[in-house]
Structure formats: C-alpha cells, structure tokens
Curated annotation (Swiss-Prot):
<dbReference type="GO" id="GO:0044877">
    <property type="term" value="F:protein-containing complex binding"/>
</dbReference>
<dbReference type="GO" id="GO:0031508">
    <property type="term" value="P:pericentric heterochromatin formation"/>
</dbReference>
<dbReference type="GO" id="GO:1905646">
    <property type="term" value="P:positive regulation of FACT complex assembly"/>
</dbReference>
<dbReference type="GO" id="GO:0005701">
    <property type="term" value="C:polytene chromosome chromocenter"/>
</dbReference>
<dbReference type="InterPro" id="IPR008251">
    <property type="entry name" value="Chromo_shadow_dom"/>
</dbReference>
<dbReference type="GO" id="GO:0005634">
    <property type="term" value="C:nucleus"/>
</dbReference>
<comment type="subunit">
    <text>Homodimer. Probably associates with Su(var)3-9. Interacts with Mcm10. Interacts (via chromoshadow domain) with piwi (via N-terminal region). Interacts with Rrp6. Associates with and may be part of the HipHop-HOAP telomere capping complex but is not required for its stability or telomere localization. Interacts (via the chromo domain 2 (chromoshadow domain) and the hinge region between chromo domains 1 and 2) with cav/HOAP (via C-terminus); the interaction is direct. Each molecule of cav/HOAP interacts with 2 molecules of Su(var)205/HP1. Interacts with HipHop (via N-terminus).</text>
</comment>
<dbReference type="InterPro" id="IPR016197">
    <property type="entry name" value="Chromo-like_dom_sf"/>
</dbReference>
<dbReference type="InterPro" id="IPR023780">
    <property type="entry name" value="Chromo_domain"/>
</dbReference>
<keyword id="KW-0677">Repeat</keyword>
<dbReference type="GO" id="GO:0035064">
    <property type="term" value="F:methylated histone binding"/>
</dbReference>
<keyword id="KW-0539">Nucleus</keyword>
<feature type="region of interest" description="Disordered">
    <location>
        <begin position="1"/>
        <end position="24"/>
    </location>
</feature>
<feature type="compositionally biased region" description="Low complexity">
    <location>
        <begin position="50"/>
        <end position="60"/>
    </location>
</feature>
<dbReference type="GO" id="GO:0005703">
    <property type="term" value="C:polytene chromosome puff"/>
</dbReference>
<dbReference type="GO" id="GO:0141006">
    <property type="term" value="P:transposable element silencing by piRNA-mediated heterochromatin formation"/>
</dbReference>
<feature type="modified residue" description="Phosphothreonine">
    <location>
        <position position="134"/>
    </location>
</feature>
Length: 206
C-alpha cells in the first residue's frame, strides 16, 4: 500500500511539482521477512481492515518507533524460545527419571525371573525317576484340560502334600496332580495304585 497520492484538484489546475502525497498511518507491525536481501514488514494500516494488510520495504516506512518496538519484542521472544529449548522443564526431567527407574526395575525383574530356582534339598521324597520329566503341580491339571488319565506312575510327599504322578493319554510328559483331585477324578485308579504296592504279612503260628 505504501504511500498514495491524493489529488483533490484536477491535473489541469495543479502541476506535477505541486502534487501532494497523503501518508497512510501504520497501526502496528505484524510480521517481518527478508526478501531478495531486503527487510520487509507486514503492516496493519490504521483505519483499514485486516484484508488491506500489506508487505512494505523498510526503506519506504517512516515509523521507526514501531519498528524498534517490534524488533525488541521479536528478540525477546527468540531468547525466551531458545531458553525453553535449552532447559527442559522439570516435568520432562521427572518423566525421564521415572522412565529410567521403571526401566531399571523391569531389567531387575527380568534378571530375577531368569535366575534358576535353588533346589529344595530333601524336602520332598520322590518315589520314581520318572518325576524328572514331569509337569509341576499348578493351578490347572490335565483333568481341567479335558485329558484322560492313563496310569498313576508314582506318588510324592511334597512338603506334606500328597501328589500323584499321572500319565495322561496323548501327552508325553507326566504331571503331578494333588491327591485330592485324583481321589475325585480317578478313585479306582488310586485304589489300584495302592493295592499294587501293598505288602501282606502273615504270622505263622506253631
């Protein structure tokens, strides 16, 4: 927009030397850019809508006060932005610390789970060598999975808890099953297991 020439009288009455320039007042500077090596400012003109804003070269402007104020404000904003970028916020530091702590805890837990469990010594008495290849007693048994028991291979007193080593059909590994479950699911097989291991003694009386 810059400066416009206003000719209130006709050109016939006024010569070129007498042409008068009417300067438009700058309300505020909105933005700044460098184009082809020259600094230009995006101006809001006083008394005109935003749609009339224009880019004007610095050397065409006569509003040094507004330019100085805008440049000072722009430098302050740049310093503030640089300061925030260089120094992360306390919340970001806290999240980073928390993340490291969580990672350390996770690593420690993983290492602990990978460590072999120490042997329990002679707390449990094993009656057969087949227990070396057994599935330990857990919350679920082969019965819970719908398997059919084929044979009781042995029994074990595990910390005062009687368990049976049961071979299920279609499964390679035998499984330790609590006696309470076996007594309910396969009572006849349990009785047969005991009968096979009973020794009968008779006293010969003269």
């Amino acid at each position: 927009m810059g400066k416009k020439i206003d000719n209130p009288e006709s050109s016939a009455k006024v010569s070129d030397a007498e042409e008068e320039e009417e300067e438009y007042a700058v309300e505020k500077i909105i933005d700044r850019r460098v184009r082809k090596g020259k600094v230009e400012y995006y101006l809001k003109w006083k008394g005109y809508p935003e749609t009339e804003n224009t880019w004007e070269p610095e050397n065409n402007l006569d509003c040094q006060d507004l330019i100085q104020q805008y440049e000072a404000s722009r430098k302050d904003e740049e310093k503030s932005a640089a300061s925030k970028k260089d120094r992360p916020s306390s919340s970001a530091k806290a999240k980073e610390t928390q993340g490291r702590a969580s990672s350390s805890t996770s690593t420690a837990s993983k290492r602990k789970s990978e460590e072999p469990t120490a042997p329990s010594g002679n707390k449990s008495k094993r009656t057969t060598d087949a227990e070396q290849d057994t599935i330990p007693v857990s919350g679920s048994t082969g019965f819970d999975r719908g398997l059919e028991a084929e044979k009781i291979l042995g029994a074990s007193d595990n910390n005062g808890r009687l368990t049976f080593l049961i071979q299920f059909k279609g499964v390679d590994q035998a499984e330790m099953v609590p006696s309470s479950v076996a007594n309910e699911k396969i009572p006849r097989m349990v009785i047969h297991f005991y009968e096979e291991r009973l020794s009968w003694y008779s006293d010969n009386e003269d």
